Structures are given as C-alpha cells and as structure tokens.
C-alpha cells in the first residue's frame, strides 16, 4: 500500500523538474518579448515563473525555505493591509515585479555551457603566493559570469586530495563575492537594477569595478601574509573561455546605446541565450540542440532556490510598498544622501551577519525608501556594496552554506577569516559613496 502511494510522489519528483525547466524557458522568452516591446504583458512571464516555482518547491529546503515563507507572509500581510485600509492591491507588481531579474539569471545560466574554466586532469596544481593571486582573479572573473558554479568547480579541484583549508576558502569567498560590485551577470546587479528604477548599469559598474580591484588587491596582500601561504594549493587557471562573456558584455552595451529604451535585464537574458546557441553551433552543430535541451531539463530546475527566493522578494517589496503608501507613512528624512546610504549599508551588512539575505534587506529598503525618490544610482551602488560585503561575512550566506555542504568548511569561520577584510571594505565603500555624491552634483 505504501509503495503504491509513493509511486505518484516519485513520479512527480521525476517529472516536475523538467516541466519546471521548460516553464522557466517559456518565462525567459515571454520576459524578453515584454522587454523588447512586442506587446505582451509582464504578468505572462511572471505567471510562468510562479508556475515553475510551485513545481520546484520540494527542491527548496532549510534556511532558504524559511526565508521564502517569511517574505511571502510579510509581503502578503502588507498587500492585505493596503487593500483593507486604502483599497489598493498591487497584485501585478507582486506577480511580475522580479520577472526581468529572474529571466536574466536564468538566461545567464546558459553561459555555463560555453564559459566553464577548463583544465587538463593531469595538469599539476600551482603552489605559493602567485597561485593564490591567480586563483583569486580566476574565481572573481569566472564567478562574475557563471556565479556560484565557479566556486564549486575550483573548490572541487582544490579539495580532491586533501581537505580545503581556511586560506583556500577565504580566496574563493572573497574573490567570488567581490564580483557583486560590478558584474552585469551577477544576481546582485539584477536585484539592484530592479529595486532602484532609473539606475544606470554603466554607472553602477564604473563605481563598482575600482572597488572590486581594491578588494582583490587587499585580499591578495592580506592572505599572502598568512602562515602557510607557500604551501597554498591553487587552481591551474586558463582564461581563454572569458572571451565569450566579454563579447556578451560588449554586445549588451552596444545594443543598449542603440536602443536605450530597452531594459538592460531583457538585453542580457535574450543575448545570453542567443550567444550561447551560436557558440555551440559553431563548435559542434550536431551537439548544440541536445546540450541546450539538457540544460533546460536539468540545469534550469537547479535554480529553484533562487527562483523562489526572488519571487518571494517581489511579493515582499510589493507588500511593503503598498502598506507604506496606503498608510501614508514616510521616513523622517528630507533627502537620502551618502551619509544615509552609508548607515543603510552598515545596517544591511549587520543583518546579513545574523542570516538575513541581502535580497530581503534590499526589497524592504526599496519599499520604505521609494517615497523619498532617492538618486537611483546612489541607492543601487549601496545595494551592490551590501550584497558584496554581506555575502562574504555571513556564515549563513548561500555561498558559505554551499561550501559547508560540499567541502566540509565550518561557515562560522568566515566571521573570523573575513572580519577585518569586511571592515576595511566598508570603509572603502563609505568613502566611495561620498565621492560619488560629490561627483554627481
């Protein structure tokens, strides 16, 4: 009897993933059509993402599930309050507020088919300070494109013969998280652009790139002074595969200059999928379609955690925004400048330390600050800084929890390993916020 009952459950688990993947692909196409001005409403893409999310719910467990449920409850309560008090119900924003962001994340995931760092299995692993610096730069650049996959690929190689050391873990953690400052393919950038309407990708990246460079330099200097650095086992990096994301970034900027009205997230998602298909066709035409389809069936469902997290964040932002607007409540601030942005940055990083995901802090801040109409670039830069520093210091960040599960690293150690680094980066970030404010006047 129990076996008969378990069969439908098992069958659902086997089929829900591929179906969810196809729904995500449909949502990417619908989102691109909306962003390119083809007359389709954003709610179609949002609905497809929500259907995929419902199918993929069983894959989301632990802290991510708790955070998702909490955001849905708070956001839902805000929507209900606004409806009861003011008769306002922003269902469309809750349904489709993050559809462009999700389409970008899903579209960029196709780049893993053509941009993975390759290495000969028999190639010797480099050692010493030079290997540390090269691995740091490698995880930063590849992570800026293929996201957390870069950390897993490099970490698998480094831990194949011996347990990962705290030095190796720090290199991967800092190098990866710094990409949040500038990368157009990083989740942080999508969240920043979605929650700071009017922000300019070029401006955000222009401010973020020097900060990332300073962070990499600081990390290389700090970690090269640690004991045992001469025995550091690095990754034999080859940077040839980076020409593809470089070409994609150039295409995005070029098309954006030619068509500035087209949303940047829509450009990234549509061009990422298109460029991946073209590269696969040029490499081996007979395998292009099978590889793309395999990614749809198996790769896209793996983003179930991000999918549900950002869907719930859309509900949270809509709920808080609706409640604030319905109640007529405003912050006691005349303007939102660099000083206020600095305080917000410190608050969000502090919340990250105790396990509050940056997307929750950003969605909440967006709902509260929207009535003040802050400089979108200033607030966008602040969000990117909060993401970069919060991810590197929090024991409960998705990256550190993934490293715990994969490599047996105690995530609480990152508070100690990255603590002084994070404080120094916050000083640099606050200085950059004030410099940007002075420059933009």
Predicted regions and their residues:
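Transmembrane helical segments that form the transport core of multi-pass membrane transport proteins
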Residues: 251-361
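Membrane-embedded helical hairpins/re-entrant loop segments and their flanking transmembrane helices
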Residues: 111-141, 148-169, 368, 373-376
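C-terminal transmembrane helix pair
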Residues: 27-32, 168, 174-188, 204-219, ...
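Hydrophobic mid-bilayer segments of alpha-helices in multi-pass membrane transport proteins
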Residues: 21-26, 40-81, 101-107, 243-250, ...
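Core transmembrane alpha-helical segments of multi-pass membrane transporters/permeases
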Residues: 68-69, 73-80, 86-115, 136-137, ...
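Membrane-interfacial loop-to-helix junctions in multi-pass transporters
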Residues: 100, 124-135, 163-168, 302-306, ...
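Membrane-interfacial helix-loop connectors
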Residues: 153-164, 189-202, 337-393, 405-407
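Flexible interhelical linker loops that connect adjacent transmembrane helices
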Residues: 222-246, 287-300
């Amino acid at each position: 009897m129990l076996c008969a009952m378990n069969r439908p459950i098992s069958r659902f688990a086997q089929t829900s993933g591929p179906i969810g993947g196809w729904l995500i692909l449909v949502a990417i196409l619908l989102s691109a059509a909306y962003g390119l001005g083809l007359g389709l409403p954003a709610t179609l893409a949002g609905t497809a993402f929500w259907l995929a999310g419902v199918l993929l719910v069983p894959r989301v467990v632990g802290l991510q599930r708790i955070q998702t449920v909490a955001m849905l409850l708070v956001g839902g309560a805000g929507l209900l309050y606004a409806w009861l008090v003011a008769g306002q119900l922003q269902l469309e924003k809750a349904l489709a507020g993050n559809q462009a962001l999700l389409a970008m994340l899903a579209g960029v995931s196709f780049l893993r088919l053509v941009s993975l760092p390759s290495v000969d299995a028999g190639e010797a692993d480099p050692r010493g300070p030079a290997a540390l610096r090269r691995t740091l730069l490698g995880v930063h650049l590849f992570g800026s494109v293929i996201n957390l996959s870069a950390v897993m690929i490099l970490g698998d190689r480094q831990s194949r013969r011996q347990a990962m050391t705290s030095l190796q873990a720090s290199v991967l953690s800092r190098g990866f998280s710094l990409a949040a400052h500038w990368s157009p393919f990083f989740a942080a950038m999508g969240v920043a652009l979605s929650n700071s309407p009017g922000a300019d990708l070029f401006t955000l990246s222009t401010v973020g790139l020097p900060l990332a460079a300073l962070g990499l330099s600081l990390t290389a200097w700090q970690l090269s002074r640690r004991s045992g650095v001469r025995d550091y086992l690095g990754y034999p990096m080859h940077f040839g595969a980076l020409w593809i994301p470089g070409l994609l970034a150039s295409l995005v900027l070029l098309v954006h200059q030619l068509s500035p009205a087209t949303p940047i997230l829509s450009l990234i998602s549509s061009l990422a999928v298109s460029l991946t298909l073209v590269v696969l066709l040029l490499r081996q035409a007979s395998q292009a379609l099978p590889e793309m389809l395999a990614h749809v069936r198996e790769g896209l469902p793996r983003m179930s955690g991000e999918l549900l997290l950002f869907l719930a964040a859309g509900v949270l932002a809509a709920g808080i925004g609706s409640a604030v607007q319905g109640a007529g409540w405003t912050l006691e601030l005349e303007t939102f400048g660099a000083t206020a942005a600095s305080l917000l940055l410190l608050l969000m990083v502090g919340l990250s330390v105790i396990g509050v995901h940056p997307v929750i802090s950003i969605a909440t801040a967006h709902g509260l600050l929207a009535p003040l109409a802050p400089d979108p670039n200033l607030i966008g830069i602040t969000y990117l800084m909060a993401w970069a520093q919060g991810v590197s210091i929090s024991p409960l960040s998705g990256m550190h929890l993934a490293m715990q599960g994969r490599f047996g690293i105690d995530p609480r150690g990152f508070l100690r390993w990255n603590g002084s680094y994070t404080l120094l980066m916050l000083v640099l970030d606050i200085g950059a916020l004030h410099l940007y404010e002075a420059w933009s006047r």
